[in-house]
Amino acid sequence: MSRYELTVQVRTRYLPEQSEPSQDQYAFAYTITIRNTGEVPSQLVSRHWVITDAESHVQEVAGLGVVGHQPLLPPGESFEYTSWATIKTPVGTMRGEYFCVAEDGHRFEAPIPEFALAMPRMLH
């Protein structure tokens, strides 16, 4: 176990009611679970996302916290939230990182592994 470590799990779903395929707008919800698997209480301060569609168009999003929160996670605790993104193709990817500060002042990044955004039945 690393002294400073947050692990990230992701679930996604297509949002047909928010999408307009005829206008190249595909919306996806993603639910993130962030768990402090380290040894020190740590706070998520900011985030950076790289969102890529099937035509290699890239959007970058950065900002403070997540959904209005900067959660402080003691070891073993987790925080879950749901947000959404839109892309211009029925398939794409997201990846990124959370920027964190441990209780002792140490700064570190928690990687968000790349995950797929895909309409149902678009990926085999």
From Swiss-Prot:
SUPFAM superfamilies with a match to the protein in the record: ApaG-like (SSF110069)
Domain ApaG, residue spans: 1-124
Pfam families: DUF525
InterPro entries the record matches: ApaG-like, ApaG_domain, ApaG_sf, Uncharacterised_ApaG
Gene3D superfamilies associated with the record: ApaG domain (2.60.40.1470)
Taxonomic superkingdom: Bacteria
Protein name (database record): Protein ApaG
Organism (species): Ralstonia nicotianae (strain ATCC BAA-1114 / GMI1000)
Organism placement in taxonomy: Bacteria, Pseudomonadati, Pseudomonadota, Betaproteobacteria, Burkholderiales
